[in-house]
Amino acid sequence: MNETGDLFAWGEVQPKTEFSWESYQWCDGSKDGLTKYNEADGKRQLETEDDAAHVILGGKWRMPTPKEYRELLNNCIQTSYLTYKGTEGITFTSKINGNTLFFPMRPETTFTGATSMTGNCWTSSLDGNTGGYNDPYFPIVLQRGIAMDIRNMDPLNLIHLERYEAAFIRPVLPE
């Protein structure tokens, strides 16, 4: 049984399988028609009711911030690619306490037709570094090309995705 997990668009709390501007909850069908988290409302951080981790798990669970993912980047090392309970993924081990995190990955076909494994995970806020509200949002990205030599690769980084695109959520529970 494969338990990769559900995929979400940014700011949506229901998982889905089709991702496009036309199906994105917070626009009128195009990138230029954002209806929430835009210049008019000035919001850059997900509200609780739009945080899938909080809505699904309740309590203090939430999606992580870009700062928290940067801490992960700085304080963990990639330890292995593996299959855990039928799900392919990647593990990272803390340089501080030795704890290990598993991130699921899924196959994805690129625009060139190549297949890679990807494990994009959303953060809870807009990329405040690039200006406008039409900019994509910071997810954490785990990616492995099928023919790529992974021994010298740093697969964990922050990039932009369009907010309608598919990504996992990796909930955090603040102390």
Locate predicted features.
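C-terminal, surface-exposed recognition/capping segments
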Residues: M1-Y24, D28-D51, V55-R62, P66-E175
